[in-house]
């Protein structure tokens, strides 16, 4: 009877260790904005009064924290009047938005330990018109994803 209790107790302890995994699963990548890690579901507000460029530059970094290289998809979901703004996203080159509400971009083979700068530009079609809106970014490598919202406020140029 003592032997059965010993094996039962040992099995419970073993299952507990296996289910807990001995710690958290390491995050394969982090997204940084202004030097800080962007938490999942974060909201970032961007205000601009740049009268020379009349656009809203916004950039973030994706850093590979894993031991392997992998590709990352960036989904841009726009929530604003698509006739008032033009956007482009720059990874290794700048690619204009396709006029759709949602677009997916790919960073191919991000090496282990490296980071990739992502530039996003939003330009008003008519710089004198004030406008507000938001863009939801989702970054995913297929197994792990994080998302954040960028809210922008363009006051217009007089």
Kindly give the residue locations of the regions a language model identified.
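Surface-exposed binding patches on compact interaction domains or structured appendages
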Residues: 67-115
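Short solvent-exposed strand-capping/beta-turn motif centered on an Asx-Ser/Thr pair
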Residues: 63-69, 79, 125-127, 142
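Short, hydrophobic beta-strand segments
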Residues: 114-126
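C-terminal motif of bacterial Sec signal peptides marking the signal peptidase cleavage site
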Residues: 16-19
């Amino acid at each position: 009877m003592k032997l059965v209790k010993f094996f039962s107790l040992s099995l419970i302890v073993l299952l507990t260790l296996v289910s807990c995994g001995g710690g958290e699963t390491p995050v394969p990548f982090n997204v940084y904005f202004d030097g800080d890690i962007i938490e999942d579901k974060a909201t970032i507000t961007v205000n601009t009064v740049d009268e020379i460029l009349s656009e809203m530059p916004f950039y973030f970094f994706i850093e590979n924290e894993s031991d392997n290289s992998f590709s990352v998809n960036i989904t841009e979901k726009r929530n604003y009047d698509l006739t008032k703004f033009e956007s482009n996203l720059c990874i290794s080159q700048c690619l204009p938005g396709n006029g759709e509400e949602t677009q997916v971009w790919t960073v191919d083979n991000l090496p282990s330990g490296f980071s990739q700068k992502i530039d996003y530009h939003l330009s008003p079609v008519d710089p004198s018109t004030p406008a507000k809106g938001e863009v939801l970014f989702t970054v995913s490598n297929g197994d792990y994803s994080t998302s954040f919202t960028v809210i922008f406020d363009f006051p217009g140029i007089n």
